[in-house]
């Protein structure tokens, strides 16, 4: 909340995945802190749509720094694997969960019951479609994926914003790494904007037109 220090709530296990997660969560914290320091109370919050951009931009910048400064081959392979796992999560898993969420809302609106078996079958079908039938799946294991994200699915239509977030973040990180101080200034202005701008306008301020 405004007037307090931002906090990060996570389990840190001293590995690359935890480091990446810490970078992600610190992106949220710095976004909040920058907004609180720059905006009046009425504009001191921001939407999830822009929040997931700041967190993923932080991750992208940390990965680039580590890739350039740690020459160890095994470490770099691990870094690439972590990045690809993150892209899979946000470009395949989250859009599929978003489709699942829409489908179960539509079923409820039609008066249909939601059973665990029906939801697992739907989840597995959506993943099979997402992978184009090219991946052999354990349908029972994949089908329960929705059960791993209760906090996200209880916040209506949250998860698709991870996909837009990482897409915008990659563009912004690349812009700052190649565009110098002007790109950094645009990004900093976006972090400070809070809800004083509509989400798409805030991203335009940063340098991304979605």
Give residue ranges: language-model regions.
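Long, charged, glycine-rich C-terminal linkers/tails
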Residues: 1, 9, 141-145
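Short pre-active-site segment immediately N-terminal to the catalytic Zn-binding motif
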Residues: 2-23
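C-terminal, non-catalytic "cap/extension" segments appended to globular domains
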Residues: 22, 30, 57-60, 68, ...
